[in-house]
């Protein structure tokens, strides 16, 4: 095998690979063995005609397609490894010379991993991130717990008041026509919650059970549906039932009912501690992100478009999987959000580019700093992932993960180590 490498543009190389005639003839014979049974030649049982007869009857090129594939599968990986080429996509293969008794020559044009010029990555200055737990946040959490533990009962008499829960049937019209998603029966709505658009809920105040009313509201300008954005609408609403909500008193008895604590003060203290931990983790994550952004701002990379497109495709697949767990699909999502595949991909582009750039920088720093994942770390990471699956035989699951996802585990571990290095060497400023 002989290989010539030509840099045809930034991050794109063309390899001209020559496979000697003897090797190519072996590939042709291999192709014959694979395809012999599908050839039907007069005078021979199907699949029993010899190679020379097949060539004469069908033409010598009949076996070239698979022979080309066999040659490329064998020689292309060796060619890129020997020339230290790191492709980011599949190559474009073009045949230059092919024929019986001739060397097989082909070109492989491929986009490569771009050069990363690291700037300063140790000692970057990043603004300190910190959060304090506000008393109001603790009170709001208590109110939320109070709401969840409220007692709800039917209001036998009287009108709808703020804070009541109304069970309604409604049907909406825009420009005098019913619209999709504008109708529901036995819909439960808390008056004053702001669930409905405009002052829909306020207009129900004062109504009694079995009474109906025409409610007039307008959709927000950016409601998210072109057919409804900013448009006035009329809803026919009928009150089916009214419920009243009784909130439990916020006292020691409440604390005992909803938690492991004996007093309200102990419950408040626990809520505050949990919030402190959450805010501390949030501050840590934001600081780490800021460090990575600062390091990225100091680096120079010309990212090939194909890398960004591939990351966008990965993001779309992730979105599709998340939707699947919710019983939805991409088509429904596009319709519901009044979007399209093109719009969603364009929206993802900036994030995709940022992800690719960050990954390239992390890989380059790992290379410079000689940061690697040890076998022990790989086992620990595989075990950590295996536990998330909830399988009975965790060790067996971890072993399968370690074998099937080794490359991903290595990247995760190495990136974590690089991030630790960057954070440890950063300078926190006020």
Curated annotation (Swiss-Prot):
Disulfide bonds: none annotated. InterPro entries: PPIase_dom_sf, PPIase_FKBP_dom, Trig_fac, Trigger_fac_C, Trigger_fac_C_sf, Trigger_fac_ribosome-bd_bac, Trigger_fac_ribosome-bd_sf, Trigger_fact/SurA_dom_sf. Residues 163-248 form the PPIase FKBP-type domain. One of its GO terms (molecular function) is protein folding chaperone. GO terms for cellular component: cytoplasm. It is found in: Cytoplasm. Pfam families: FKBP_C (PF00254), Trigger_C (PF05698), Trigger_N (PF05697). SUPFAM superfamilies: FKBP-like, Triger factor/SurA peptide-binding domain-like, Trigger factor ribosome-binding domain. Its EC number is 5.2.1.8. Keywords: Cell cycle, Cell division, Chaperone, Cytoplasm, Isomerase, Rotamase. Gene3D superfamilies: 3.10.50.40, Trigger factor ribosome-binding domain, Trigger factor, C-terminal domain. It catalyses: [protein]-peptidylproline (omega=180) = [protein]-peptidylproline (omega=0). One of its GO terms (biological process) is cell division. Belongs to the FKBP-type PPIase family. Tig subfamily. Consists of 3 domains; the N-terminus binds the ribosome, the middle domain has PPIase activity, while the C-terminus has intrinsic chaperone activity on its own. NCBIfam families: tig. Involved in protein export. Acts as a chaperone by maintaining the newly synthesized protein in an open conformation. Functions as a peptidyl-prolyl cis-trans isomerase. This is Trigger factor. It comes from Clostridium botulinum (strain Langeland / NCTC 10281 / Type F).
